[in-house]
A protein has these predicted regions:
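Ser/Thr/Pro-rich, acidic low-complexity intrinsically disordered regulatory segments
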Residues: 1-3
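Low-complexity, serine/threonine/proline/glycine-rich extracellular segments that form mucin-like
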Residues: 23-48
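Sec/Tat signal peptide C-region and signal peptidase I cleavage site
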Residues: 5-11
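Glycine-rich, aromatic-bearing surface loops/beta-hairpins
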Residues: 97-102, 110-166
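Short coil-to-beta strand junction motifs in C2/discoidin
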Residues: 27-33, 64, 116-119
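Structured domain cores in non-transmembrane regions
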Residues: 40-114
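Short amphipathic, basic-aromatic surface patches that mediate peripheral association
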Residues: 16-28, 51-56
Length: 166
């Protein structure tokens, strides 16, 4: 009697390391940050994370922070305005200065199942009484080998590292 042995199918994964620099400013506000994947035609394949002021106010149950999401202009125009926030597993509170890691497995929300091809990881930050910055890292999907491409922002973002694993 023969037995069929099933080999587990492992989906490719990616991790994103986002550095938020501590700025020397008299009025410092934590930045709003959006992280998403774009296809080669600049359409959004999936929004991975959106950090914004989620604190609720007694007179505004959704929190006043949602009205400032549009300050992340590129994300907003490419698909953010269609997102009904909050979204479990995607939206969260703003983060303090430092390094923050996000990990995703293909096909497990919020990481979409991607068709093979060229993509960009895009990270956008906008800060009240501050600036706005967009950093992108091109990559091929699915990864054929473990790679760690990086890009560095100039003011609102520090080093952005994409950790791809087949």
């Amino acid at each position: 009697m023969s037995a069929l042995l099933a080999t587990p199918a492992f989906a490719a994964s990616l991790a994103v390391n986002i550095e938020i620099p501590r700025l020397n400013a008299s009025e410092y506000h934590r930045p709003y940050v959006a992280t998403w994947i774009e296809r080669a035609d600049n359409t959004v394949a999936g929004t991975l994370a959106v950090w914004y002021d989620v604190r609720t106010k007694t007179n505004n149950p959704e929190g006043e922070g949602t009205k400032w999401l549009k300050d992340m202009r590129q994300w907003w125009r490419r698909g953010g305005r269609e997102l009904a926030v909050p979204v479990d597993g995607v939206t969260g509170a703003t983060k303090p200065a430092g390094k923050h890691q996000l990990s995703f497995n293909e096909g497990t929300a919020p990481m979409p199942k991607l068709v093979p091809g060229a993509y960009k990881l895009v990270v956008e930050a906008a800060r009240e009484v501050g600036g706005r910055e967009v950093v992108s890292i091109p990559f091929q999907w699915p990864p054929t080998a473990a790679t760690q491409p990086t890009a560095t922002g100039k003011e609102e973002l520090g080093e952005i590292k994409l950790d791809l694993k087949p």
